[in-house]
Amino acid sequence: MPRADPNLRNRARRPRARRGGGGGVGSNSSRHSGKCRRQRRALSAPPLTFLATTTTTTMMGVASTDDDSLLLKTPDELDKHSGSPQTILTLTDKHDIRQPRVHRGTYHLIQLHLDLRPEELRDPFQILLSTPLQLGEANGESQTAPATSQEEETAASHELEKKKEKEEKKEEEDEDDRNDDRERGILCVVSNEDSDVRPAFSLFPARPGCHILRSVIDQQLTRMAIVRLSLNLFALRIITPPLKRVPLRRKAAHHTALHDCMALHLPELTFESTLDINNVTENAASVADAAESTDADLTPTLTVRVRHAVCWHRVEGGISGPRGLTSRISARLSETTAKTLGPSVFGRLELDPNESPPDLTLSSLTLYQDGMLRFNVTCDRTEAPADPVAFRLRLRRETVRRPFFSDAPLPYFVPPRSGAADEGLEVRVPYELTLKNSHTLRIYRRFYGPYLGVFVPHNRQGLKMPVTVWLPRSWLELTVLVSDENGATFPRDALLGRLYFISSKHTLNRGCLSAMTHQVKSTLHSRSTSHSPSQQQLSVLGASIALEDLLPMRLASPETEPQDCKLTENTTEKTSPVTLAMVCGDL
């Protein structure tokens, strides 16, 4: 099963015959195509596994080597040999299955190149890569010195105290606080610009197991003598937006479409300010005390307590917020309180476990110019909750270092039901939708922050949805292409796809901001910057990302070695691989 032609070591540099037969192909190309076909007779059946020849390229794009001795070195020795740990690993289909080689090291980009015959694409399942793979720390790796026994005992006692404090405050905390400012990594697989086969743009959690790439085979590919499959594999930094915090919006005019279900007065309002000086927290007794501190030291907080019987109105979702039963509550703030709150104020609900509906959410929060504060609370149910309803609305000035939505994310954006934050938010249809023709579905939510939203569609028969880039301060518009003559029907809560927010540093290419295609491609190029005269960057989805801003991917041996144990979370005798496989057929 080996492919032992030394002339095919670097397939990217040789001309490839594009079409077989006699249609405009020269004699040299015909002989070359026949030679390739004879060499590939032993490879007509999958699986195909990349496990051999490597080309390690430094970030500056100067050094390139095919020295097999690099494969026998430790990761540290490999990094020293290449001159930089930020490298590109290039894998080809040239391998020996009797003596598979393991590519150990840390890389920012893995390129897979494979030349196939058209009939090989008919095989439904092909393994492209199978290797133990681990991502680096998203927020930076930290090394600590070994602690003494006394330090370990002290640390253990502190851990117990912290654990008790966390258990006491567990009811007050929410998922937003526990995941605050945490970046995660996700694997991205996309075709290279010289690839004939264009699999669908795919994002995968970096967990062991088999991940499927789907690809549609064009009829033109069947007339080629050799078909090139070229993929780029890299890891993006992603971050999860807060789902239980709603920003305070300020407006000048009142809207009287919905009357206030209840009006609160000053006794139900509590204004306090948290003063943080030299890690000592104090509560200012009044607004006057709070005004003496600077904005950098002052964190004003307004708490609105509600324990009343309220009226409920039915809404179907949309701009007004989530669907279900909603109640509109108002409270008039004094001019001093409204001024002291300042900008960048977020609100969230604190529920009473005994008297609050568990599905109660904050759907909108608005402060008008005359000091009137109005907010809507919604619960997704058909029957009104029992009276009275008890909860607290807490408004707090804070700096959110994550993307946040203009209004409540529900019912459009839902956390993944599996609970894994690296799987992105689920984008669902809030109501039953029937389409006869192609349609643009607009979701009336904006997000803010220096991030890039990416919508990856879910596979659905009879429909085609392109990968869509979502820019800050804009609506999310999804294009649905209906291929079935009878149209398509989306039931309520149908899954459209997943939404990710990329936190890797990037620059936008204004010429191609939206990836309104089904088959996305990527390009590796060099760009001069103020920090580097020749910086290697990867362009994908209308954005360019420097390789150094991608998460490093560490390839380990199948058997865990002593120096690898400290880098793995669950130390086992054998590390499970991350496997990529391609399925040809309908997207």
Swiss-Prot record:
One cellular component term from this protein's GO annotations in UniProt: host cell nucleus
Recorded coiled-coil stretches: none
Biased composition (Basic residues): 10-19, 32-41
Keyword Hydrolase attributed: no
Basic and acidic residues bias: start-end ranges: 155-169
Chain spans, region Disordered: 1-48, 136-185
Cellular compartment(s): Host nucleus; Host cytoplasm
Composition-biased stretches (Polar residues): 140-149
Keywords: Host cytoplasm, Host nucleus
Short motif (Nuclear export signal 2 (NES 2)): ranges: 360-367
Domain of life: Viruses
Motif segment (Nuclear localization signal): 161-170
InterPro entries xref list: Herpes_UL84
Motif (Nuclear export signal 1 (NES 1)): 229-238
Family affiliation: Belongs to the HHV-5 UL84 protein family.
Subunit organization: Interacts with the DNA polymerase accessory subunit UL44. Interacts with HCMV major transcription-activating enzyme IE2. Interacts with host HNRNPK.
Role summary: Plays an essential role in viral DNA replication. May participate in the DNA replication initiation by interacting with the origin of lytic replication, oriLyt and subsequently recruiting other viral/cellular factors. Additionally, interacts with and shuttles IRS1 viral mRNA from the host nucleus to the cytoplasm.
Protein's name according to its UniProt entry: UL84 protein
Species for this entry: Human cytomegalovirus (strain Towne)
Phylogenetic classification of the source organism: Viruses, Duplodnaviria, Heunggongvirae, Peploviricota, Herviviricetes
Gene: UL84
